[in-house]
């Protein structure tokens, strides 16, 4: 089956999981055309749809907070069934809408499914990693637990 366009998440709701033929048959679902091998599943061209404001406007809307630039430990610190996560992060301190200082090795924790309900703004600039099939604009979230020095 060919890969086709689908909205995995829309308006904070999970619409579909991704299935290859094996798992679709096992779970009584239709394949979504996302096989990466006989047993693997991988999205192609997966991205978060852009919003309507610039990255600068998003930082101004944040005011004071943290701008995350990387997360580590996705395989060990995230529970795919419950959505709970506790991950090491790096980023920048944001004061009055301006990135002021780098911040390293802090922890962010929460629940992925709850975060979908805590999106307050999405920037208009989608970025893909080098050689990556995954992309996203900057996203402003409320209510994430953060700890560290």
Where are these regions (language model features)?
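Dual-mode signal for accessory low-complexity, basic/Gly-rich regions
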Residues: 1-149
């Amino acid at each position: 089956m060919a890969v086709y366009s689908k909205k995995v998440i829309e308006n904070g709701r999970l619409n579909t999981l991704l299935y290859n033929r094996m798992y679709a048959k096992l779970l009584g679902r239709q394949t979504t055309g996302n096989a990466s091998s006989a047993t693997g599943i991988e999205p192609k061209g997966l991205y978060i749809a852009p919003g309507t404001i610039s990255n600068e406007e998003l930082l101004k809307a944040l005011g004071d907070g943290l701008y995350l630039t990387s997360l580590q430990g996705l395989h060990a610190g995230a529970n795919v069934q419950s959505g709970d996560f506790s991950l090491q992060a790096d980023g920048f301190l944001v004061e009055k809408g301006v990135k002021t200082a780098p911040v390293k090795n802090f922890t962010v924790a929460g629940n992925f499914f709850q975060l979908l309900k805590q999106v307050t703004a999405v920037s208009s600039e989608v970025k893909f990693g080098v050689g990556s099939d995954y992309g996203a604009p900057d996203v402003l979230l409320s209510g994430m637990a953060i700890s560290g020095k």
